[in-house]
C-alpha cells in the first residue's frame, strides 16, 4: 500500500518532446513585427481600394460620374468665359472713357479759345472807346460781346453734352450767367 500511495502522490511526468508554449516570446524582433503590421495595412488598403473600384464600376452608375464631370467642366468654362468677357468690357470701357476725356479736352480748348477771343475783343473795345466816355458804355459793349460769344458757344455744344460732365456743368454756368447778364 505504501508503494501504491507513493505512486498516487507523485504527479505524472510530462514528456520532454513537447515543452509548454509561452504566450509571448522573450526575444521579440521589432523589424519582423513592423513588417507584418505594414503588410496587414497594405492588404487592408488594397481590399478597400478594390472594393471602391468595384462599387464605382458596377454599383454606381457611370452616368452620374460623367454628368458630375461635365457639370464641373461647364462651370469652369462659364467662369473662364465670363472672366474674359469682363476683361474685354473693362478695356472697352477704358477706351470709351479715353474718348470722352479727349472730347472734353477738345471742348475745353475750344472754350479757352473763345475766352481769349472775348478778352481780345474787350481790349479792342476799350482802346476804341475814348477816355471821356462813361463806364456805362464800356460795360454795355462788353456785355454785348460776351452775350454773342456765349450764345454762339452754347448753340455749338447744346445737343451733344450731358449735364453731369464737367463741360455740361460749365454749360449750365454759362446759361445762368447769360440769364444774369440779360437781367442787368
UniProtKB/Swiss-Prot annotation:
Keyword Ligase: no
Protein name: Uncharacterized protein C23H4.13c
Main subcellular location of this protein, as a coarse class: membrane
Domain of life: Eukaryota
Location relative to the cell: Membrane
Keywords: Membrane, Transmembrane, Transmembrane helix
Annotated transmembrane regions: 35-55
Coiled-coil segments: none
Membrane topology value: Single-pass membrane protein
Amino acid at each position: 500500500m505504501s508503494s501504491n500511495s507513493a505512486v498516487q502522490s507523485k504527479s505524472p511526468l510530462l514528456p520532454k518532446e513537447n515543452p509548454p508554449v509561452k504566450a509571448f516570446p522573450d526575444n521579440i524582433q521589432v523589424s519582423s513585427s513592423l513588417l507584418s503590421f505594414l503588410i496587414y495595412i497594405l492588404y487592408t488598403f488594397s481590399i478597400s481600394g478594390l472594393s471602391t473600384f468595384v462599387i464605382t464600376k458596377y454599383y454606381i452608375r457611370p452616368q452620374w460620374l460623367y454628368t458630375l464631370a461635365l457639370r464641373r467642366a461647364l462651370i469652369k468654362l462659364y467662369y473662364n468665359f465670363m472672366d474674359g468677357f469682363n476683361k474685354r468690357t473693362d478695356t472697352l470701357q477704358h477706351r470709351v472713357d479715353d474718348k470722352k476725356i479727349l472730347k472734353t479736352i477738345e471742348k475745353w480748348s475750344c472754350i479757352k479759345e473763345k475766352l481769349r477771343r472775348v478778352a481780345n475783343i474787350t481790349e479792342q473795345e476799350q482802346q476804341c472807346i475814348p477816355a471821356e466816355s462813361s463806364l456805362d458804355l464800356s460795360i454795355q459793349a462788353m456785355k454785348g460781346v460776351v452775350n454773342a460769344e456765349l450764345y454762339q458757344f452754347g448753340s455749338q455744344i447744346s445737343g451733344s453734352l450731358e449735364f453731369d460732365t464737367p463741360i455740361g456743368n460749365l454749360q449750365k454756368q454759362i446759361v445762368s450767367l447769360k440769364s444774369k447778364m440779360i437781367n442787368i
